[in-house]
Amino acid sequence: MKTDLVNKINQSTAHRKSRVYLSNYIIRHEELLNEFISIAFDIQNENHVKAFWSLEFVCEKKLKLFTPYLDLFCEVLPKIKDDSAVRPATKICMFLAKSNHRKNGISLSQEQEHHLIEALIDRLIQDEKVASKVYAMKALFVLGKKYDWVHEELKTIIEQDYANHTAAYQAATRNLLKKLNK
């Protein structure tokens, strides 16, 4: 028998309104977060992608709810293959990197930072959609403020790939390259 949460995830769609509704439901019912995260992180689960769609909004609104799951997220991140889950996962990485950089934000351990950096660099090198690559670049740029070598690696990857990508990718990377060249 499916739980109420599983039914809600199953009924959700890619439409923003649906994803926001489910994320608000999870925020209001924090006791369901563990089950929700388990579904999102189980890449064999038929609802894994749908759960990730709404997890992005949970993290955008209440990132601190996600902190107990950071180690597990770092473990699952490189294993995510479905493009529809990769995009929200890389966006969550961006939220984590930005929050980690703020004084009153969440604190990632050095090991978590290294796991994120490794997974994000892999995403840039792999054949991913532009949105996923842009979120990965933004997260790496922030993480590179602490680890200088990350900026050098990011710059090298962007410059090598620049001519081979779409106009959308080139537009997104142009400003980042300017910041990296300062």
Regions found by a protein language model. Name each.
Residues 1-182:
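Alpha-helical scaffold domains
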